[in-house]
Amino acid sequence: MVKIGLEVHVHLTSLKTKLFCSCPSDYTGKDPNTNVCPICLGLPGAIPVLNENAVKAAIMVALAINAEIANSLIMVRKHYFYPDMAKNYQISQYDGPGSIAISKGGYLKLREGKTVRIRRINIEEDPAKIIYPTGSMLTSKYTLLDYNRSGMGLLEIVTEPDMTEPKEAREFLEKLRSILEHLGVCNCDLEGAMRADANVSVEGGERVEIKNIGSPREVEEALKYEIARQKAAIAQGLPVKRETRHWDSERKVTVPTRTKETEEDYRYFPDPDLPPYPITQDLIEEIRKTLPELPDLRIKRLVTQYGISDYDATVLVMDKALADLFEETAKHYSNYKKLVNLLINDYLRWLNDKNLRPSQSKAGSQHLVELLKLLDDGVITIKIAKEILPEIVLEGKMPSSIIKERGLVAIKDEDYLINVIKEVINEEPDAAEKAKNDPKVINYLVGKVMKKTGKRADPQLTNELIKKILGIK
């Protein structure tokens, strides 16, 4: 039996400043170690002050995942010795004596009905960024530290070990990401904005933690590898150590980094510089009123409002930018099913293949409306639409402009198409004969015509002309 639990670290990118000081939270483009102050660097005598907006963001997330919110917030010091934490402790929270996490409980439901319970949400500070300039953690000759990130506000969302397959962990993270984006508390496209530690054990063995994985897809890959590694060790009669491992995304393997600490090793105790922060019911209700439409409700609305399937609505809403693009385009194009098919089967598939997200695309609703109308009017074929998609997405070019530049208008000249079809029939006499009794072979001949015309032949007209020439009724 496999047990999987997750610890998800979410940057509160909606904050203007860091968690305990006034340093800006946006350090994009700044030189290393310039977005810092005595508090970020843990210098003696520097006193932290809690950013109240971080508390409000955490309450929003807790409400969205059906959690029980505490009536006060108590921060603790989590002690460990590692170069990314200058003061040798992290200001965090702990589910134990002397601390109160901002929320406990809660859950998310996966597509097939499985419930993943959430143990708690903690507010904590982010450590510095460790850089390996000449390779990976294992191969780099030296290490650099950038404290620009140190002290950024984080939420740590800890699940129970309710998942049994890597694909469930990926789905959980994708759904959580959608919630965070709908709430507006995290821009998950930013590097490192959402990272996960995956804990996994096989057949009741020791728990292994895979640290700092950058995306839902990589979490799935890392877990697949780690489960296979543990099963192989068990089959050979070898022990599985309780340890922390690193996911090497280039080699697609996990590698050991250190023995896994126990809770006692961290020597938690309340931070004397940060008094308890009260959370009133009035504050919770005030924040509840500001919650936007969340993914589950949006899925139901899309099904009702646009008549699309529950599956299609779910795929759209799992990425807020994709759902937003659908709804904006639907204001100007009423064939919703055709729009969904283009978005999911062509647009999203291409983005996934290139490891891009919809929010990184330069295609807007105006691009999609024009592309769909060109298809409806028979000006281009679906093959041409797929061919020009990269230029639309990466450069933001209008479809009509690309078609004009590259001469990609669909060919509807019957005389021209008949000549091409006759060429194909002469080259493929056996296929032409089989086509008289097998409709599937007609599609093969259509494909040959498309190839000869650079994908520009109108497929429906070509199909009709082939049947006419071969005497197929």
From Swiss-Prot:
Enzymatic reactions: L-glutamyl-tRNA(Gln) + L-glutamine + ATP + H2O = L-glutaminyl-tRNA(Gln) + L-glutamate + ADP + phosphate + H(+); L-aspartyl-tRNA(Asn) + L-glutamine + ATP + H2O = L-asparaginyl-tRNA(Asn) + L-glutamate + ADP + phosphate + 2 H(+)
SUPFAM superfamilies found in the cross-reference section: GatB/YqeY motif (SSF89095), Glutamine synthetase/guanido kinase (SSF55931)
Coiled coil: none
Top-rank EC class of the record's enzyme: ligase
Family (UniProt): Belongs to the GatB/GatE family. GatB subfamily.
Subunit-level organization: Heterotrimer of A, B and C subunits.
Function: Allows the formation of correctly charged Asn-tRNA(Asn) or Gln-tRNA(Gln) through the transamidation of misacylated Asp-tRNA(Asn) or Glu-tRNA(Gln) in organisms which lack either or both of asparaginyl-tRNA or glutaminyl-tRNA synthetases. The reaction takes place in the presence of glutamine and ATP through an activated phospho-Asp-tRNA(Asn) or phospho-Glu-tRNA(Gln).
Entry protein name: Aspartyl/glutamyl-tRNA(Asn/Gln) amidotransferase subunit B
